[in-house]
Amino acid sequence: MIRHAHLVGFGLAGALLMHQLQKRGVRVTVNDRVDPQSSSHVAAGMITPITGQRVKPTWRGQELQEFARRTYAELEHDLGISLWKDWSLVRVFRTDTMRT
């Protein structure tokens, strides 16, 4: 059994990994470089079940979104803060060709 883990990077992925490890009793230390241009700061943890120009559902997107909802709800409870917000997506097509 792993007793200690050291994470390099504490963006969204690092924070979620730390949470999962700590749930399993692993002591975690972290090194992180503060970068305001990192994807964790720029995209703010955005999750979308669709991808690509054709706006198709992501492979296993629904399953992953359900896992994310459960994980974020657990973190919200543990930390006493709000982390999850549902947003609507509006896709504007300039031409009929873009619509198909």
Regions found by a protein language model. Name each.
Residues 1-3, 38-39, 43:
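Accessory recognition modules or surfaces
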Residues 46-100:
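Dinucleotide-binding Rossmann-like beta1-alpha1 core, especially the glycine-rich loop
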